[in-house]
Amino acid sequence: GTRGDVLAYDSSGKISKISLGSSGQVLKSDGTDLVFGDLAGATNVYYVSKNGTDAAGRGGSIDSAWASIKYACSNLPVTPTKLAPAVIFVKSGTYEEAQLPIVVPEYTTIVGDNLRATTVKPAPGLDSGGSIVNKRSTLFRCSNGVIIQDLLCDGMDGYTPGSPGSDPTAGTLGGVYFALNAQSPITDKSPYIYNVTTFGNGATGAVVDGSLHSSGNRSMLFHTVTHIHSDGLGIWAKDNANAEIISGFTYYCQIGYTATGGSKIRSLNSSNSYGEY
């Protein structure tokens, strides 16, 4: 035999060998025989962890988790829907995501362990297009019905103010943490960013760009979101977009919250501190 293999009686009453399963799999009963497999998971619930592996057939349990959020979002085995949404739990650790952006599918929720446990950053190198430095790309492209919560995001940079400094259309954007997915108009539920803190010198918290969609609400919702961006930008709604900010805070930003091109921001219990505009 081979190390780790198990002997058991088969359907003929003879002793047969059960080969050792993959790392993280467990020996369990399928009701008839013993088999190695993943721990049973809930429908449409997936996991990313620091000891995970980005490979097909994984993600369905914490013991067979994926290793990156981008891989998880790009390889969900079932397309999420309004009646059958997906949840991706991102366990404690720092995740350096390569070849941004992460395009979050419709009706998908990304949940970190908490602000002090799960951190998401851009990896070194270029973005998926191969021409922009990864940290000056966009971290998350959010689709209709998306929720992102309980994360700390760090590492984006590159916003350069223009003249006048209060006008973002005169400046140059660098790295952005949250933006709309051009391929997914907001027809049902706005992307909902909840309990998230972002850091970064010259980073931009969110750009809600209404010009990406010819229909839908062109909207995002931010609840308990803090942006700490020295000389950066907090949230920019542009070109007939809509943003709602509840208990949101920016610190040290060149511009805290701004709406241009017919856009609207509704802000409750929020503030911009120690910045310029």
Predicted regions, residues:
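Acidic glycine-/aspartate-rich tracts in secreted/extracellular proteins
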Residues: 11-13, 31-33, 51-56, 93-96, ...
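Acidic Gly/Asp/Thr-rich repetitive segments characteristic of extracellular carbohydrate-active
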Residues: 50-90
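Extracellular beta-strand-rich solenoid/capping regions of secreted or surface-exposed proteins
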Residues: 77-80, 96-111, 119-150, 154-187
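Residues in short coils/turns that link rungs of repeat/solenoid architectures in beta-rich domains
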Residues: 117, 155, 199-201, 205, ...
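Right-handed parallel beta-helix
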Residues: 147-240
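Detector for repetitive beta-architecture
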Residues: 33, 45, 85-87, 92-94, ...
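Extracellular repetitive beta-rich solenoid segments
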Residues: 1-44, 64
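Short, T/G/N/S-enriched strand-turn elements that build extracellular solenoid repeat scaffolds
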Residues: 17-19, 70-82, 95-105, 138-142, ...
